[in-house]
């Protein structure tokens, strides 16, 4: 009898343990697959592609790669003497036409005062027309001077905002053309995270919800808030042919791959050592409040850590 009870007890304990293990694994799996999280997330930032508005030789480079610069700080300078001479030439043209306009104004005024009693109407009109022509030439010379002044000012390339110089690929003595990108500036305090979440998990990733960001290869957890969700993504299953007809890819009815939608997350503390833009991270949306780790069960903590491994 005791042997039978002992065998029954062992069997019951085994069954209970198996059931508990199954429940734990099921809960962990549900939490792992259905909660709003993704490992496909990247740090991003506002990046300014800095290109000169004038062409010429680079005479001086004032910064080095990955340097933190302030707004208005000089990055590099382009051949100023050439543009200084162009400005002086334009100023000389303005001075010439100013003197000429003064002479023609006096001449036209004198002829208008004398009137048709002293000369023909044709001579009076001719003087007025010459004055108008000179005034137009003066206005054109002034515009050329202003443009030359603007070009001279833009030979000095300055940082448009506080940030980090990155991918600096210009050196003293090189010739750079107008509009060619010389350096990228990653704006300070503009970092955010783009989390590409599956459409089945968007319900738990609404704007205003709190999020945890864990950079790849780090145990540090950053805090943030869901800022916005993309309004649309490209439909990869539908294209158009040459005649404008829709082309729909064949699909298996029982296999449906969830689309990924970009979710923008605003970081709480921009003063921390933010990871470089483009690096990857794991994002977990915790809901309206931050997650209280002290109240997490063992299985939830385990599922939370499993996210780092796939």
Curated annotation (Swiss-Prot):
Cellular location(s): Cell inner membrane
One Pfam family linked to the record: HlyD_D23
SUPFAM superfamilies: HlyD-like secretion proteins
Keywords recorded for this protein, A-Z: Cell inner membrane, Cell membrane, Membrane, Transmembrane, Transmembrane helix, Transport
Transmembrane segments: 12-32
InterPro entries the record matches: CusB-like_dom_1 (IPR043602), CusB_D23 (IPR032317), MFP_Efflux_Pump (IPR050393), PHBA_efflux_pump_AaeA (IPR022871), RND_pump_MFP (IPR006143)
DNA damage as UniProt keyword: no
Gene Ontology terms, MF aspect: transmembrane transporter activity
UniProt function note: Forms an efflux pump with AaeB.
Assigned protein family: Belongs to the membrane fusion protein (MFP) (TC 8.A.1) family.
Protein name, UniProt field: p-hydroxybenzoic acid efflux pump subunit AaeA
Protein source organism: Shigella sonnei (strain Ss046)
Gene that this polypeptide is encoded by: aaeA
